[in-house]
Amino acid sequence: MASVQQNGQRFGVSEPISMGGPTEFDVIKTRELEKHLQDVGLYESKEEAVRREEVLGILDQIVKTWIKTISRAKGLNDQLLHEANAKIFTFGSYRLGVHGPGADIDTLCVGPRHATREGDFFGELQRMLSEMPEVTELHPVPDAHVPLMGFKLNGVSIDLLYAQLPLWVIPEDLDLSQDSILQNADEQTVRSLNGCRVTDQILRLVPNIQNFRTTLRCMRFWAKRRGVYSNVSGFLGGINWALLVARICQLYPNALPNILVSRFFRVFYQWNWPNAIFLCSPDEGSLGLQVWDPRINPKDRLHIMPIITPAYPCMNSSYNVSESTLRIMKGEFQRGNEICEAMESNKADWDTLFEPFAFFEAYKNYLQIDISAANVDDLRKWKGWVESRLRQLTLKIERHFKMLHCHPHPHDFQDTSRPLHCSYFMGLQRKQGVPAAEGEQFDIRRTVEEFKHTVNAYTLWIPGMEISVGHIKRRSLPNFVFPGGVRPSHTSKGTWDSNRRSEHRNSSTSSAPAATTTTTEMSSESKAGSNSPVDGKKRKWGDSETLTDQPRNSKHIAVSVPVENCEGGSPNPSVGSICSSPMKDYCTNGKSEPISKDPPENVVAFSKDPPESLPIEKIATPQAHETEELEESFDFGNQVIEQISHKVAVLSATATIPPFEATSNGSPFPYEAVEELEVLPTRQPDAAHRPSVQQRKPIIKLSFTSLGKTNGK
């Protein structure tokens, strides 16, 4: 393998952290990793690969026939008619070479100036596809942020975008990497081209494409198993993971995938967000397109985990990340780092790293969002809309009630006994470090109702599209959320996560007074009385509040939350920044502040490796701009940006990687939940009338009555 030193090329915005090559141990562990990825079915067969290539060839011929047809219909002269052309490009996981069996192929059709998006792409081409027997499940989405058509061609799923270039003829050797291709292009075309341009640029900026692909396959699989693979839910999507892996490949250009995976967790566990990730210095360009730059654009300062695309115009690919989802991902990076260190001493293996996250064991309280529609097509549209708005519910709850953390599950669940229904779940946990007065309650009825009102204001809403939001305890979760529809008889044992939880509980018991959590939970459950759920079903608040009769009516929930250990300051107070950014002065005033609180005494150090030299330039991080962005629409006015600002502890860059530490509350498992929620009976609204937003207030309260008892007061 040619090293970066040998060919004299430097990748990225900084010098590498390590130029070290692989050891025999690395070769063995990488082979084990590759075998594991093959065993779990991440690689497609040769037959499927050939079929995909054939389908792409068919699609290319379809768009070429389409462009000839519309050119003739528009009366172009013989020369232009002869030269009329459209071309298919691929991007995303297929172009990166990390797609798996049955995965969609992201494709882009590039057409000339006279082939319009509205009239021709979503007109004639859509008609042609709808009449072809080999095309099934055709779903045009012309109003999306990036308009596309989804369909299956000979059984292969295709997402087709369109870019209309200001050219009369599209050459076969068209190079999309040239910035001039964006000149005079509309915004939708720029966004459509961006996928191909970013994908190709990533492949140009990594030192070894094969090592990059293996590592990215691993990280995508890991993220899906751990429930942090979903851009729409506020986690990271495919392009985000590709950019992060590419950056690690730049920092360790001669490393094999086993080391790249380990260093991925090591680097990003310590990364001082919101310092941005860059693969190359951002190009401001000469076309006047807006680029990500928090020095100029105030909205860019709101991003808390910026991962910047390498192609002009550079954008933040991770703008959906929230405070809670960032906290969850940092916890997962910490877990991954611990396991990779344990693997070096043969105390863990790849199976341990890829253990699925037990979402329905991690919390004691959940929100359940149920939706339904009249038919399959309506449900598909309704699901897409609701999924795009669920992040707003998370942000609203966290903004309005700063003592709660929300953990959204990235996927929906289907109850086979209820066709045309699906459910989403969010774990609820009291936020650590928030002081609370005894008996204090917080009514979030309006928060939930605003969310439902926004969802129900869907411009394509039709009767039959329904939504309801309710609280459910862990013991009452429906069976359809569990694998095979069978509720486990006991919680997971023997896994890395369960062992770490046990260790944490044992250490907490030995160092703290007698716990009163169990007593509190039992007493709180007894208060529920007849409202307690039976037979695993979700609580009901009356016939008028059922999904069918009154889907927009409110649910009434009270939350009783015992005290948890509080976190102080940064999650890793002694961990220095290893960030590197070409934008040194994008913060408000260029100043940095020391950690305001001392690290807790029970912090555990995990690192065994000697520190690595980091020849990375120092930068100043933003002083206080870690905020969250809420989007409002419809009856709540135009898009509104609401900020939640809190002091960000800033650490300056250092020249070494210090030892790793646990979270500031001493817990290696950041999702430990100790609170209980209870339902309060309330007067039901009149089912004959649809109440207004002000009238429809689900009583969802947080009660801190038991806090004094938990503290031993």
From Swiss-Prot:
Binding site for ATP: F91, G92, S93, A103, D104, I105, D106, D159, Y229, G238, I239
Alphabetical list of InterPro entries matching this protein: NT_sf, NuclTrfase_I-like_C, PolA_pol_cen_dom, PolA_pol_NTPase, PolA_pol_RNA-bd_dom, PolyA_polymerase
Name by which UniProt lists this protein: Nuclear poly(A) polymerase 1
Cofactor needs: Mg(2+); Mn(2+)
Positions of transmembrane segments: none
Catalytic class of the enzyme: transferase
Sites where the protein binds Mg(2+) 2: D104, D106, D159
GO terms for MF: ATP binding; metal ion binding; poly(A) RNA polymerase activity; RNA binding
SUPFAM superfamilies: Nucleotidyltransferase, PAP/Archaeal CCA-adding enzyme, C-terminal domain, PAP/OAS1 substrate-binding domain
The protein's role, per its UniProt record: Essential protein. Polymerase that creates the 3'-poly(A) tail of mRNA's. Also required for the endoribonucleolytic cleavage reaction at some polyadenylation sites. May acquire specificity through interaction with a cleavage and polyadenylation specificity factor (CPSF) at its C-terminus.
Catalytic activity from the UniProt record: RNA(n) + ATP = RNA(n)-3'-adenine ribonucleotide + diphosphate
Organism (species): Arabidopsis thaliana
Recorded family membership: Belongs to the poly(A) polymerase family.
